[in-house]
């Protein structure tokens, strides 16, 4: 189950996508559908079929974003978070082999297209929550447990 949390930046990104789809792309595609429909036979009209399909995709995404944004809770930075890993933190970790990772713990709807973001619901994020610099986080993986040490914690203020 995904936790309905999002950073302010993530919420603004979703809002911009919704605005773009609803105010710019959808009206443009609607015009193309109308134009293609006016050409006659729709069964063999590739422009009509493609744009009709695109319109359905846009409408599906708009419905998803609208419903999703109603249920999301924006989590802003709080000074009480300083020094510990919480939602929205940039965390640098290192394992026993010296491998280092740096990522931000964010909501499910923010991770797509970003390799440096992980979901708050991931095993790694759950293991890191409330840890401080120097703490050991034991992460359950499909092949057993992995040990990671917290090297740094930063917040976007």
Curated annotation (Swiss-Prot):
SUPFAM superfamilies the record matches: FKBP-like (SSF54534), GreA transcript cleavage protein, N-terminal domain (SSF46557)
GO biological process: DNA-templated transcription elongation; regulation of DNA-templated transcription elongation
Record's keyword terms, sorted: DNA-binding, Transcription, Transcription regulation
GO molecular function: DNA binding; RNA polymerase binding
Superkingdom of origin organism: Bacteria
Pfam families: GreA_GreB, GreA_GreB_N
Listed NCBIfam families: greB, PRK01885.1
UniProt similarity note: Belongs to the GreA/GreB family. GreB subfamily.
Protein name (Swiss-Prot/TrEMBL): Transcription elongation factor GreB
Protein source organism: Salmonella typhimurium (strain LT2 / SGSC1412 / ATCC 700720)
Gene coding for it: greB
């Amino acid at each position: 189950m995904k936790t309905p949390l999002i950073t302010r930046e993530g919420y603004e990104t979703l809002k911009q996508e919704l605005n773009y789809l609803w105010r710019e792309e959808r009206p443009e595609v609607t015009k193309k559908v109308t134009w293609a429909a006016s050409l006659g036979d729709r069964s063999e009209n590739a422009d009509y079929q493609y744009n009709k399909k695109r319109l359905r995709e846009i409408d599906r995404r708009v419905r998803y974003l609208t419903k999703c944004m109603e249920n999301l809770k924006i989590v802003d930075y709080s000074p009480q978070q300083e020094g510990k890993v919480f939602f929205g933190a940039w965390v640098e970790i290192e394992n026993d082999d010296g491998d280092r990772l740096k990522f931000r713990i964010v909501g499910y709807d923010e991770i797509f297209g970003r390799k440096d973001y992980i979901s708050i619901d991931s095993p790694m994020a759950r293991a890191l929550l409330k840890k401080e610099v120097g703490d050991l986080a034991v992460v359950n993986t499909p092949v057993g447990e992995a040990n990671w040490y917290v090297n740094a914690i930063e917040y976007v203020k």
